[in-house]
Design a protein with these regions (language model features):
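Signature of dsDNA virion morphogenesis modules
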Residues: 1-172, 176-188
Length: 190
């Protein structure tokens, strides 16, 4: 009798001899996410698998900086002082999640209790409404191109976090950044 078995084990982050953190966490996922409009109302944006798992989107995360919080779009003129690590691989689909190999060189954010992850990226936002997995959405994100991966206190994706054992951490203040779309819509992100 021929059979197949797939043993599952949770991937844990490891520390190198130098104290760097190596991990392969979920960095984002598909689903409907709330965003606040400039007038305080909420809109709900769909990150559909057809867009999230597009190969050019998955390829765009490789080599991007891991940052301490979100600091706007990161490039060679503003990366010093905010970059704490790097994404070492392209994104890979794992169910509804995107995973990637990362290294964190400056671990002070993590040691201070921040272990959630939040992607910074550009996209085209379409006004499209519908229902996805029982959740209503009003907009759809397309053409996702990653710019950085931020270490934050609480990420929007919920399950995007480092694979660390829980320990007591100190509270830190989160930074908010305001983004304005070409159509004039503004929203805050952490």
């Amino acid at each position: 009798m021929t059979m197949q078995r797939f043993d599952v084990s949770e991937i844990k982050a490891t520390r190198t001899d130098e104290g760097f953190i190596l991990d392969t966490p979920a960095i984002t996922r598909c689903g409907v996410f709330p965003y606040r409009n400039a007038d305080g109302t909420m809109r709900y944006e769909l990150r559909h698998p057809d867009d999230v798992f597009k190969q050019d989107s998955l390829d765009s995360i490789k080599g991007k900086p891991v940052t301490a919080l979100h600091n706007g779009l990161i490039d060679n003129t503003n990366s010093t002082g905010v970059t704490v690590g790097a994404v070492m691989s392209v994104g890979r689909q794992d169910g509804d999640n995107v995973t990637a190999e990362i290294v964190i060189h400056d671990t002070s954010m993590v040691d201070g209790g921040n272990k959630d992850l939040s992607c910074g990226y550009t996209l085209n936002l379409d006004e499209e409404s519908g229902v996805y997995n029982g959740q209503t959405y009003t907009h759809r994100q397309r053409d996702i191109k990653y710019n950085h991966l931020a270490i934050v206190k609480a990420g929007r994706a919920g399950n995007a976090r480092l694979n660390l054992d829980s320990i007591d951490f100190q509270e830190e203040k989160e930074t908010m950044v305001k983004y304005r779309l070409d159509n004039g819509v503004e929203y805050d992100v952490t």
